[in-house]
Amino acid sequence: MRTILTAAAAAALSFGAFCAALAQEDAAGGADALEAEAVTGSAADYFGRDKFTVETIVCPFKGKLKYKPGEISCGLLTVPENREKSRSRAIKLHFVKLHARKPEKWDADQRGEWKKREDPIIYLTGGPGAQAVGYVKRFKDHGARDVRDMYILEQRGIGLSDDFCPNYALFDPAVANVGAFEAYQRAALAAMENCFAGAKARGVDLAGYNTIENARDVEALRRALGFEQWNVWGISYGSILGQAYLKQDPAGIRAVVLDAIVPIVPGAHFQRVGAHFQRDLDLLEKACLENDVCKRATPDFQKRLKAAMSKVAKAPIEVAAIDTELFPSGKAWFFPDIIGGAPFISLYEQDNYPTLPAFIAALAGRVERGDYDAFRALT
């Protein structure tokens, strides 16, 4: 069962994590061939071709998110694709600024006159590979902006940051529309391999897409914006990037908060994810059993979740698809990764914890009854 939990949790993580791992593996294979182009000297030399300038752009999500002029702004930062190589091409990275704004309820008697702090927050996004727009939605009304500007840098290779697999999810939907989990996994892997092959054919240097370069990009943005120091906040993969950034730019960091910390050792998060998921389920179950209402309503939700995952592993969920453009066969299949992945993703937000036992019990109940009609909403 630990294997199934690991697979479910890993599948719930973003495509970018796999993309980055495969890209770095590909890059490692050609390391000898790159030595002639390698930058040598001190660490400062790695920024020898950075211009530390930004250009203002209209935010790509304008018209899709509601905000007033002056609340959110966007820009591009030009950086070398691979700072390890002297002849690397330049790429542009997208960043978003969420401007500090005085809260409607500001207690001047207790907190003094409102004034914006000059030490902003840089939020390190997750994945790797999560686009900035999701974080803009999440933080545009967040209390962290009460006195500080917040910056979000879209990691290289995704979104508006020179996406090297644009429209990745739109190609050939029939390939992954299969009824066997193993075939689905093979199709997903083949799509990633095709993405990398196409990127390389267009001259993309995959060796430049890694956590070290991401950390250097964060320093480059800080210097381009003219801040001596800022406050660093990273969650999930952002905690890996945060650890790398601590080593990269210690003098540029005023304070750092890393949440849901993942080891910086390559691959360690996937090796441990099943154990961590199991620990979270155990803690959730313990809390439920200590609450009379929860104990009466959902006393065995963890056992039922695992049984549901086992059932779906043997017999995948099959439903009639609503959108036949996305599911050309007219059918859609779901596997145990979605049964375990739904509560796994829900664990990211503490606000979900009180309802999680009931949610898991309801999800397991659907599987127990073979009542899969609700899954059509995902098609």
Kindly label every feature range from the protein language model.
Residues 1-4:
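Positively charged n-region of N-terminal signal peptides that target proteins for export
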Residues 7-17:
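Bacterial N-terminal signal peptides
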Residues 19-25:
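Boundary at the C-terminal end of the N-terminal hydrophobic targeting segment
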Residues 25-32:
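Long, low-complexity intrinsically disordered segments that are proline/alanine-rich
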Residues 34-338:
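Gly/Pro-rich cap/lid or specificity-loop segments adjacent to the active site
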Residues 304, 308-311, 359-362, 377-378:
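Charge-rich, solvent-exposed alpha-helical interaction surfaces
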Residues 331-364:
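P-loop NTPase catalytic cores that bind/hydrolyze ATP
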Residues 368-379:
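Small-residue-rich helix-loop
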